[in-house]
């Protein structure tokens, strides 16, 4: 945080430190954010970008290559801390972009813990109970980061320094940086609020009562008051406060008592998922693997046709209410009733992929796959025998001889072998609803909800259900598919979340060309709703969970799924094409520009004299541009003359100047494979809206001109 009595630092070639507890250590979603964003950030900053996190020896051993710092100021800072007994690993993170990382061994600083806890109380009035190991780790890590930043700016006196913190676990350093007047400018991004996650997990009408919560009392009742204090202090101590979505910004304004300066949506490394023209073939290949599982799981009751079978799924952390699993199961029951009433021949197999406590795979699940494998092996043997006999009979054929008959081709031995396999497929029980033995079967919320709505995989049911309480893996003996391959093989992802600050699962569906259902309480759902008119035409269905009652929302979700079952195969193929072409909307090359704007705003606030003293309000506010529905239904989104932006960071002037595809502001959707098939251009609806402080710096250059 800069001060007027100090010489302004050089902002043009500023340094960037990004601080999080998941650097080179997978715990949750922030790891995915940092890893997927790294190529874009390193391309912009090069060796001026360093990630800071706590050292996890196990993951660092395989993810980090140790190096000597080339920057003399950084080298001097690290040495000064090592001289005081602090363990530090500096090196290259072995991911795309190869960013530099600085990892602190927090265990080497635990001797300072009591001193630092006392100081934290004196500085920020934040209590810290002894028995909360996660908070203890956050405090030690926070003090090490503040120590490092203070030491570093004493060595580096020329260049401006930006420190960007993610989540409360990395946020302890923020009030310390402000109190000590360390000459860095800071950004804090909350990916979800502590209190929001706790409140939503209970039976609370969260969003309609946000302004009425006594936040201190609610945090105290849940035993997280000290954590909430850290999060709130971080939000109020930073120069620029951001969240990952507008819905989380609304939540943060009421729970953390500061209105965010802007929104930094999560992007994806679209190249990782890119399959170009192959994605339809990949869908077919992986769908066939899911067919194999379904044949085994439902053996003895497999009376539905693969071509009339649709695969729906939901996946994520096991948060029964927050992830909307309760609504998904209830909607499946209503969908089952509607399909049976309509006399539909379509069968829906719904998968729930959520890791829970299990002991082993069920005997029934293993037996089903073994029975089908035996049947397939037997049929292969018989098939080869028939082929050989047809060939031998044909070689000896003379004019006037009859064609080979069935009795000559299938031997009595073949018939006995086949009859044995068919008798082995007899089943006197219904196919199981879960693939594993659960640790607490009778207390599991998902299983109890399935039992309540009586979705027991009965032959008359048009909706079947499979709960797979384990992460997917190609090494799984029952469902041998990695998650990405499984998603490609399905037809529809359903994520009816009640609390979802962003939502990577529907975003991943989009870039893989799989339609999805989300809600307007998820960050991703809000983002796409603002960006696209009639988003369902592009394979993104948005359920209203904010203004509708629970029953109405369930009915809306049921209606979306029912409408999807009525689509023809050709309509589903066209919709997948449109969905996949939205990938560029979610690429970090576009989303990353919001991070650029946040950093520029932080520099302007810390070093206003470097920007000719212009006020934030003097800059052009944002313009929101919407992608309209496609003229052709079914069809594909395309663009002949207009520009599209993933956020509200392009001005009207820029969008009419015909900026190229490579320009960071404007972009075009990929061209059609057959441009002549659809003669109409994609039109954009433009509507001006209030800008955020981040919008004000869109045309800003470092010398203060526009």
UniProtKB/Swiss-Prot annotation:
Q: Name one Pfam family in it.
A: Glycogen_syn
Q: What class of enzyme is it?
A: transferase
Keyword Ligase: yes or no? Answer: no
Pathway membership of this protein? Glycan biosynthesis; glycogen biosynthesis
Q: Where is this region: Disordered?
A: 670-706
Known EC number: 2.4.1.11
State the GO CC annotations: cytoplasm; glycogen granule
Q: How is its activity regulated?
A: Allosteric activation by glucose-6-phosphate, and phosphorylation by a cAMP-dependent kinase.
| UniProt: alpha-D-glucose 6-phosphate binding residues | 277-278, 280, 283, 287, 491, 572, 576
Q: Which GO terms describe its molecular function?
A: alpha-1,4-glucan glucosyltransferase (UDP-glucose donor) activity
Q: Which GO terms describe its biological process?
A: glycogen biosynthetic process
> What InterPro entries does the record point to?
Glycogen_synth (IPR008631)
Sorted keywords for this record are: Allosteric enzyme, Glycogen biosynthesis, Glycosyltransferase, Phosphoprotein, Transferase
Q: Which reaction does it catalyse?
A: [(1->4)-alpha-D-glucosyl](n) + UDP-alpha-D-glucose = [(1->4)-alpha-D-glucosyl](n+1) + UDP + H(+)
* Assembly with partners or alone: Interacts with glucogenin gnn; the interaction is direct.
Q: Family per UniProt?
A: Belongs to the glycosyltransferase 3 family.
What does the UniProt record say this protein does? Glycogen synthase participates in the glycogen biosynthetic process along with glycogenin and glycogen branching enzyme. Extends the primer composed of a few glucose units formed by glycogenin by adding new glucose units to it. In this context, glycogen synthase transfers the glycosyl residue from UDP-Glc to the non-reducing end of alpha-1,4-glucan.
Protein name listed in UniProt: Glycogen [starch] synthase
Q: Which organism is it from?
A: Neurospora crassa (strain ATCC 24698 / 74-OR23-1A / CBS 708.71 / DSM 1257 / FGSC 987)
Gene it is expressed from: gsy-1
